[in-house]
């Protein structure tokens, strides 16, 4: 079993129940999934660019990403409907906990000038979004093998009803929130 999953089951659940006073154990917030999205803007001119992004995301997550396509044409962006414009991966279960563990303990500390993640990136429904500027912070990515520095969005979807509950859940996992 993943280290963070064990920590959740043994410590975090009890702490959340004590703090928020849940009557039913099914009310306790839990991490549902982590979605990692990589937008590849240059894919409109160069269709091969998407392959490198897919490879990077596969190396980081250990799961094959799905290529996302444009929903509609936008002339200002030189975008046609159905063109590949990015890729995303949805992690659940043990893979999700393993990824979160690596993100918190290995990748985030490698970010330059890192003072913690923003505590304001919650969406009001208990989901947290984190933007990363470069894929190099993950140790699985080799510096010499990449063609271009790419960023990604990481969305942590929880079953929490409010941002406060979700913040406590992620803090329990060890997410380093910045103090205002």
UniProtKB/Swiss-Prot annotation:
Presence of keyword rRNA-binding: yes
GO-annotated molecular function: rRNA binding; structural constituent of ribosome; tRNA binding
Keyword Ribonucleoprotein: yes
PROSITE patterns linked to this entry: RIBOSOMAL_L5
Domain of life where this protein originates: Bacteria
Record keywords: Ribonucleoprotein, Ribosomal protein, RNA-binding, rRNA-binding, tRNA-binding
UniProt-listed Pfam families: Ribosomal_L5, Ribosomal_L5_C
Classification via SUPFAM superfamilies: RL5-like (SSF55282)
GO annotation terms (biological process): translation
GO cellular component, as recorded: ribonucleoprotein complex; ribosome
NCBIfam families in alphabetical order: PRK00010.1
Family named by the database record: Belongs to the universal ribosomal protein uL5 family.
Assembly and binders: Part of the 50S ribosomal subunit; part of the 5S rRNA/L5/L18/L25 subcomplex. Contacts the 5S rRNA and the P site tRNA. Forms a bridge to the 30S subunit in the 70S ribosome.
Role noted for this protein: This is one of the proteins that bind and probably mediate the attachment of the 5S RNA into the large ribosomal subunit, where it forms part of the central protuberance. In the 70S ribosome it contacts protein S13 of the 30S subunit (bridge B1b), connecting the 2 subunits; this bridge is implicated in subunit movement. Contacts the P site tRNA; the 5S rRNA and some of its associated proteins might help stabilize positioning of ribosome-bound tRNAs.
Protein name: Large ribosomal subunit protein uL5
Species of the source: Moorella thermoacetica (strain ATCC 39073 / JCM 9320)
